[in-house]
Amino acid sequence: MDYTSEIAELLSRRGFRRFMMSRTQVGHLLLAGHLDDRPIDIVLDTGASKTLVELTYCRSEGIAVTDTGQVGHGGSVYTLGDARLTLEGLPVRTDGIFAIDMSSTNQRLVSKGIDPIRAVIGQDALRYHQAVIDYATLALFLKEQPA
């Protein structure tokens, strides 16, 4: 018996919105979103503690970043300040949007003919929005009014 539609209906009644995902060639779950007014593909990463954007992408798009003085993922960590990340118009609540250099990861992806990662939704957003991931239908459910 297929319970996926019942799950979706229950979550909808409880104030969740459904966002459809796709899989990349290496299995990453991918969402379509916006960073301010720019369309951007976003990888859902349950292992990432924070939501982030690739530093080279920020620089190529003229997105202002500020060095936090912290080090992570092999380099400096930057913040995007008041940048706004949205999924189908829903503002994604985070602990702040950070930027890191993901060039080593992206070089490996590109060498395999796979698009580079531009942004990642991490555990901060998933926690605030009480995320439910339905792997059977590749759907992400986020509570519209975050906790």
Located regions from the model:
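Pepsin/retropepsin-fold aspartyl endopeptidases
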Residues: 1-147
